[in-house]
Amino acid sequence: MLSSVLLQAALLALVSGVTGHAVVAEPPPRKTGPSHEAACGAAVVDVLENDIAGPIENAMAKADEEYNCNAYLCRGYQFEDNTDNVLEVSVGEVLYFHVDLIAGHHPGYANVSIVDTSTNEAIGDPLRSWDDWPNHLSGPPRDDIDYNVTIPATLGSSCSEAGNCVIQWYWYASGNKQTYESCHDFYVV
């Protein structure tokens, strides 16, 4: 009987260990597809598909000769696989976001930024940031998993075409050095 309980506990710990941590659920973020697999390789894509909320580093540990993408830009997810989810936004528009926090036991910092997809660099200051995420609030309400962002007027024409920019949610768990991202394609009209 005791061995059965220990086995169940070990299996639960194993499943918990491979289950991811956090991913934006609303609005729907970029996801995998054929272009993603062609760019990043089957081994990396398999890891990311098996744990959509897991750290990018888990996938990078499986990178092989097929890997030819930047997994640290939207987990390597490609615009071409996500054209049905492009957001059309206006300057000053407020967008609601919800993060599914699956396991937040590795605190770090997080932010939401507009990122130029050609350089993987933020355009301007973060739209939101948290120095201690996800421990920032015990909530409810929690402004770190349910929050709004406002499309800034400072983007100029850099984000006027779909695919040029993403709204990126970024969490770096500094204790265990793991990176989590969700990206949303958009363009400003």
What are these model-derived regions, one by one?
Residues 19-189:
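Structured recognition/catalytic domains enriched at protein termini
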